[in-house]
A protein has these predicted regions:
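C-terminal lobe/lid and adjacent interdomain/linker elements of RecA-like ASCE P-loop ATPase modules
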Residues: 51-140
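Short basic/glycine-enriched coil/helix segment immediately N-terminal to the Walker B
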Residues: 26-34
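Conserved ABC ATPase signature
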Residues: 1-27, 41-47
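Conserved active-site beta-strand-loop modules that form the wall/rim of enzyme catalytic pockets
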Residues: 18-19, 33-34, 68
């Protein structure tokens, strides 16, 4: 019908609210050529929207002042060399006494054709949680 209808933002999904919350900081970083740091970019955000933000920040036609984006994420779909260079992808791994170690994907020298998401989920690059399978037979 072409009629505009207003919605109260609190009735929007968590992902929609998060996308609106990122709008100002993303635009500010792009316009000012600044660094934008987002912890857990993927929290309540659809993977395609996370990719959109990364692509937007890396698009030289949009980000003409060399804005930078640093994110933490659990979204393995972002492990994509069409989206990020290998030297832009870093992992964090817990060490003894709960210290965290940060290291780049480029340390592993993956082939250009390598499926990074698959390699990460298989443990090739580390940075994955150690989870034991639950036992339901009463044994430990």
């Amino acid at each position: 019908s072409g009629e505009l209808v207003a919605f109260d933002q609190r009735f929007e999904s968590a992902g929609t609210q998060r996308m609106f919350a990122y709008g100002g900081p993303v635009i500010g970083a792009i316009e000012g050529g600044k660094l934008l740091v987002i912890d857990e970019l993927d929290r309540s955000l659809h993977p395609l929207l996370a990719r959109f933000i990364v692509r937007l920040m890396h698009n030289p036609a949009v980000s003409t002042k060399a804005a930078q984006l640093w994110i933490t994420t659990h979204d393995t779909t972002l492990l994509d060399t069409d989206l990020l260079r290998r030297d832009q992808i870093w992992f964090v791994e817990k060490e003894e006494h709960q210290a965290s170690r940060l290291y780049p994907l480029s340390d592993f020298k993956p082939r250009k054709s390598e499926a990074l998401e698959w390699g990460y989920l298989k443990g090739r690059y580390g940075g994955i949680p150690f989870v034991s399978e639950p036992r339901f037979d009463g044994s430990r």
